[in-house]
Amino acid sequence: MAILGLGTDIVEIARIEAVISRSGERLARRVLSDNEWAIWETHQQPVRFLAKRFAVKEAAAKAFGTGIRNGLAFNQFEVFNDELGKPRLRLWGEALKLAERLGVAHMHVTLADERHYACATVIIES
């Protein structure tokens, strides 16, 4: 196995809150997959939930070396937790096609948040 990419991102939670205050659900609709949206709608801390998902997806886009463009969209990266609570990534659409083209076999995700910030790192391996 070889490391194909590494990405990290930090999000100021207050910025996400400000965007939601200004534009309602638009950011959440753009960022979240259908499964994540269902969780977001009933989450006790929806702003924090969205900030963490945004950080992971930005980190993933950086790890893939593409950013969010050329057919890639935030909602093609889905963050979920395995049976032990570890964050994982599931890919859809163009993100999945890109991973297959690059020969991605494993994606490692770490996610942390505290009062003001959410931070994520994604490593992709062949």
Swiss-Prot record:
Belongs to the P-Pant transferase superfamily. AcpS family. GO terms for cellular component: cytoplasm. The keyword Magnesium applies. This is Holo-[acyl-carrier-protein] synthase. GO terms for molecular function: holo-[acyl-carrier-protein] synthase activity; magnesium ion binding. Keywords: Cytoplasm, Fatty acid biosynthesis, Fatty acid metabolism, Lipid biosynthesis, Lipid metabolism, Magnesium, Metal-binding, Transferase. The keyword Magnesium applies. It comes from Citrobacter koseri (strain ATCC BAA-895 / CDC 4225-83 / SGSC4696). GO terms for biological process: fatty acid biosynthetic process. Mg(2+) binds at D9, E58. Its cofactor is Mg(2+). Its main location: cytoplasm.
